[in-house]
């Protein structure tokens, strides 16, 4: 594999997101795009002598690079290395190695010492390869390195490698526990991604390592801090289940974000710093170390110890707002009091798991676990109890705690009460029990002027639906009094409002005309929107009317009279209406013509003789007036049922605060037992299905075949199921016995001509042995038909 320096595309812009290795899977394969270019920083005349000497040294080192070919070896050319404009493509490799076919080139060897001249490479993406971490240690300015999906198992890193590396992605590899410990010597590593490495445990000395015996003296022990600048650690999608992993991570002093999603963690343990009572113990914790180092130890100190001045010393002090909590104060921060130097932690950050009763409260000489941790995520784990999460209260800087998709919150609603009252309300820790769904990006569509619709659609006016009435015809009536009973009958009969109003209009319109010439206006049909039609009919008829006579009532008088309508006129039988009309006409003809009509006041009450039979007993409803203040309730039955339900089942709102003085019932998870799926029968072939169909067609359905002995002997066991078969078999057996006796008696009668002895005689076989042999013979062949059987 070949390597190069700063990479630029044809447009002159750097593409640092995916510059190693060069890929064109997600880009359009254009001419000249996706290749590696070696760009000179400037002319050789403007470069300093040191840089020119470095390039000359590189040129000499490249001369010694060997290239193996298939069957032959050739030396490479010197004048084609530093020439600008050379592209690492197929033509360059074929011309540079003097081969005709690409299959002739087997190996390209590029030394790692060549990378030290590329001072501007800060990011390398080498994921989905088979490259080790050690292949990139010679890049002097490398800050970000992505080595995901490389199958890395072990790591070999020395002091002085990757001095400026800050971001390292080793996701989805196969790292061992020892390989993770070897990464602790990187001095400036801030972000470490270890997702999907199949880790089952973490080393106990992950944060602190004991110095080798060859370096330390026999009278003192020294410890070296690991991961001095680590702030973000991703350990999700592993197999961590032991609570000791928290003890391994608690000593990381700069850790601010820790992700342990998709593991098998059950609880968080209570942690406390280990106290070492040996006076000779010393650790390289910074300026607060009480013991001085020997001179030979300073000389042999590795690169890691040279950067100890950058490590901050902290002091554990009680908080002013809450005495139960502690805060960490760093000596390098401004405003730090020098009078508190006696409380600086002089013990190595090694933590152990202790029960709650064994913790030493308010011990200011001990450092708290995770002193700077602000974000902790334990989603998709197996935490089922609230007590298993309470130890996060000992983390002094924790601000956000994520625990969604755990059994603790999977089967309940809301934040658990103990965590809400103690962690959220008292300590101010933000609890996240639900997965935060990221909002989707809004898609912005480009607006073109040609797409804009400029035409306006006129609004359709809202007009009521008008029904066309039949045309009016003029007819001659014999007298004026013949139409008055019709109007009175239309007012008295129970009809709709529109019908009652329209029935009065013909009588008003006919005033002023002679009795011999009047216009007849038929009533319009009854419809749902009767009010609209009545108003239109009134306006239509007002054009053809004349003045009202003083004898007729005015419009105000007609409106003042109100009526109650029980049903429509169309529901009455035509024979009843016709009969009532004739009776009313005869009654009006007998009245004197000078008698005035009384319209005002209460409406006339019809006699019971003129009402249909189904209205008998309801005459008072025709003259009663509704109460104007009465409001008819809607859905009174449902309201009554709802009121009864509320009275029987009152809603009691309990307090959301937990009752700490009472015993709480622990949550017991009920496992769902899935029913066993029955094993499906073997699939039959087409020939077997056809055979089954032919058998069903051939066998009669009214005959059931069963062995006689099985039915008779198994009746006691399957009495309820085969009781009918048992009775049928018993009847057939009796019939067979009777038939057998008839056969024997008939055969004996034809042979001897005399009446045989009864079958129950015990001395029959002894006195007449020939009859006994004959009976045995008949027992064997009783099923064969005989002539006597057919005659009988």
Curated annotation (Swiss-Prot):
Signal peptide: none annotated. SMART domains: LRR_TYP (SM00369). One of its GO terms (cellular component) is nucleus. Its main location: cytoplasm. Residues 490-517, 537-562, 577-601 are annotated as: Disordered. PANTHER family: X-RAY RADIATION RESISTANCE ASSOCIATED PROTEIN 1 XRRA1, X-RAY RADIATION RESISTANCE-ASSOCIATED PROTEIN 1. This is X-ray radiation resistance-associated protein 1. Induction: By X-ray irradiation immediately after exposure and is then down-regulated two-fold in an X-ray radiation-resistant cell clone. Responds differently to X-ray radiation in clones of varying radiation responses. One of its GO terms (biological process) is response to X-ray. LRR repeats lie at residues 104-125, 141-155, 164-184, 188-209, 229-250, 254-275. Residues 723-745 form a coiled coil. PROSITE patterns: LRR. Residues 549-560 have a biased composition (Basic and acidic residues). May be involved in the response of cells to X-ray radiation. SUPFAM superfamilies: L domain-like. Keywords: Coiled coil, Cytoplasm, Leucine-rich repeat, Nucleus, Repeat. Expressed predominantly in testis followed by prostate and ovary. Low levels found in other tissues including peripheral blood leukocytes, spleen, thymus, small intestine and colon. Also expressed in neuroblastoma, glioma, breast, lung, leukemia, renal, ovarian, prostate and colorectal cancer cell lines. It is found in: Cytoplasm; Nucleus.
